[in-house]
């Protein structure tokens, strides 16, 4: 079998016996997959967009433009989009053509855009205008103390599909990628000084051991935050092995716990001071730490983080100065994170399917990829 490459050359490959292929069409509506290793996340993988069945005639018609827009895609889910008005509402209707339509018991789902909810959501819940809202830490105590509202309050379940962590900017300068421009941090945050510091292993380890996650988690989960702690990039209850053991309890992961250790933090800080002083770094090292004002309590988490970490690392030496900055409430991703307008930032990643490998995507970058 010969395959023509994009440069016009051809490559010859040996013929493949189709009986060895691990995918079989049993009938018009059934595929059988045969795996050559245990993969507990395989079923969730099949629900990921690239693995959804493709409608053959449409694929042939659009070729490499297939699924590049709403007009070139085709699917047959439980609901279809019946109405859509930007910044007003959208309506989903039950799809009678779905293969399992008899098991869909809701006929219509209506989403209504409500700008007011971002500002006065809790009061709208009181009035019965909306079903739920996020309560900021400013009013949580008063709601819990009020007999008319205390039973309305409940903690959100831990988000098992997302991993939360802190990220550093190792290249705080303007840089032109083929498909993206990184502006970097402003001169007032001393990017040259920062670049030397962040590329020091001792500096980064000082941060690792200085962060007490319980302090920042207590801002948004004062009723109990142990279930929200992460000790690795894979959240608990996200996936399990073929024997049903949670991935975070497998192998060496089972022994991971909080890294917070003041003595170790100061040990690495002192080593970093000696190393960085020799490299010409000036202290305190400025660290821009932006937040999105549209996210409830993010600003308060930043304040608590700053106080807690500086209390550890600045004990006995003026080591760092964390400078909290407010980003835009709209388009924060492109305006701050993707253009590198930060030195330290809180970050999260949502996996595409139940495989721990998907949690590592933010930590590497394909050639030509602008990053996340």
Please state what every model-predicted region is.
Residues 1-3, 92:
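Short, small-residue-biased leader/transition segments that mark boundaries at the very start
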Residues 4-19, 196-205, 209, 213, ...:
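Extracytoplasmic/peripheral linker and loop segments enriched in polar/acidic and small residues
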Residues 8-12, 16-19, 29, 35-110:
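Gly/Pro-rich hinge or "lid" segments in bacterial periplasmic/extracellular proteins
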Residues 31, 77-79, 90-91, 107-112, ...:
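Short, well-ordered beta-strand elements
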Residues 48, 97-144, 160:
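Ligand-site clamp/hinge motif
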Residues 93, 194-313:
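Append "and occasionally in soluble cytosolic enzymes with long acidic Gly/Pro-rich linkers
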Residues 93-97, 115, 162-202, 219:
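A bilobed periplasmic-binding-protein/Venus flytrap-type ligand-binding module shared by bacterial periplasmic
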Residues 125-126, 130-135, 147-153, 308-372:
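Periplasmic binding protein-like
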């Amino acid at each position: 079998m010969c395959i023509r490459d994009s440069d016009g050359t051809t490559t010859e490959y040996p013929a493949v016996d189709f009986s060895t292929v691990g995918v079989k069409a049993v009938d018009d509506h059934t595929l059988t997959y045969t795996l050559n290793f245990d993969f507990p996340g395989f079923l969730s993988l099949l629900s990921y967009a690239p693995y959804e069945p493709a409608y053959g005639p449409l694929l042939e018609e659009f070729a490499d433009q297939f699924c590049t827009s709403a007009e070139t895609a085709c699917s047959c889910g439980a609901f279809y989009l019946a109405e859509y008005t930007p910044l007003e509402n959208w309506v989903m209707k039950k799809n009678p053509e779905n293969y399992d339509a008899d098991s869909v018991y809701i006929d219509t789902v209506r989403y209504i855009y409500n700008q007011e909810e971002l500002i006065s959501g809790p009061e709208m819940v009181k009035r019965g205008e909306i079903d739920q809202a996020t309560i900021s830490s400013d009013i949580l105590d008063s709601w819990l103390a009020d007999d008319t509202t205390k039973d309305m309050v409940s903690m959100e379940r831990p988000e098992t599909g997302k991993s939360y962590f802190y990220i550093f900017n190792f290249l705080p300068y303007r840089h032109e990628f083929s498909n993206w421009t990184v502006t970097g941090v402003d001169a007032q945050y001393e990017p040259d000084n920062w670049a030397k510091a962040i590329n020091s292993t001792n500096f980064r380890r000082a941060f690792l051991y200085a962060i007490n996650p319980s302090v920042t988690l207590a801002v948004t989960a004062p009723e109990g935050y142990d279930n929200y702690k992460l000790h690795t990039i894979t959240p608990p209850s996200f996936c399990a092995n073929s024997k049903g053991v949670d991935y975070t309890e497998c192998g060496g992961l089972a022994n991971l716990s909080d890294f917070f250790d003041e003595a170790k933090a100061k040990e690495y800080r002192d080593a970093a001071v000696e190393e960085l002083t020799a490299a010409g770094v000036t202290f305190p090292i400025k660290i821009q730490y932006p937040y999105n004002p549209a996210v409830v309590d993010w600003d308060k988490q930043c304040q608590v983080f700053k106080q807690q970490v500086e209390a550890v690392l600045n004990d006995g030496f003026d080591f760092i100065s964390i400078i909290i900055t407010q980003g835009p409430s709209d388009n924060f991703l492109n305006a701050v994170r993707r253009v590198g307008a930060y030195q330290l930032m809180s970050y999260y990643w949502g996996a595409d399917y139940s495989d721990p490998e998907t949690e590592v995507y933010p930590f590497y970058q394909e050639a030509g990829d602008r990053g996340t």
